[in-house]
Amino acid sequence: MTPSLANFLWSLVLGAAIVLIPATVGLIFISQKDKITRS
């Protein structure tokens, strides 16, 4: 694997992590709050 290809793959992985992790945490947080307000 060339260094530039490795850097490209790492940027994809980091980009996905930066987007997906806060989105997942946010969804879990909202669903937890939603459950509390309903019951």
Swiss-Prot record:
CC per GO annotation: plasma membrane-derived thylakoid membrane; plasma membrane-derived thylakoid photosystem II
Taxonomic lineage from the root: Bacteria, Bacillati, Cyanobacteriota, Cyanophyceae, Synechococcales
Assembly and interaction partners: PSII is composed of 1 copy each of membrane proteins PsbA, PsbB, PsbC, PsbD, PsbE, PsbF, PsbH, PsbI, PsbJ, PsbK, PsbL, PsbM, PsbT, PsbX, PsbY, PsbZ, Psb30/Ycf12, peripheral proteins PsbO, CyanoQ (PsbQ), PsbU, PsbV and a large number of cofactors. It forms dimeric complexes.
Transmembrane segments: 5-28
Record-linked Pfam families: PsbX
Family as reported in the entry's similarity comment: Belongs to the PsbX family. Type 1 subfamily.
Subcellular location per the Swiss-Prot or TrEMBL entry: Cellular thylakoid membrane
Disruption phenotype: Cells have about 30% less PSII and a minor uncoupling of the antenna. Modifies the quinone Q(B) binding site, increased sensitivity to high light (2000 umol photons/m(2)/s); the PSII dimer is less stable under high light.
This protein's UniProt keywords: Membrane, Photosynthesis, Photosystem II, Thylakoid, Transmembrane, Transmembrane helix
Organism: Synechocystis sp. (strain ATCC 27184 / PCC 6803 / Kazusa)
Its membrane topology: Single-pass membrane protein
Protein name (record): Photosystem II reaction center protein X
Chief site of localization: membrane
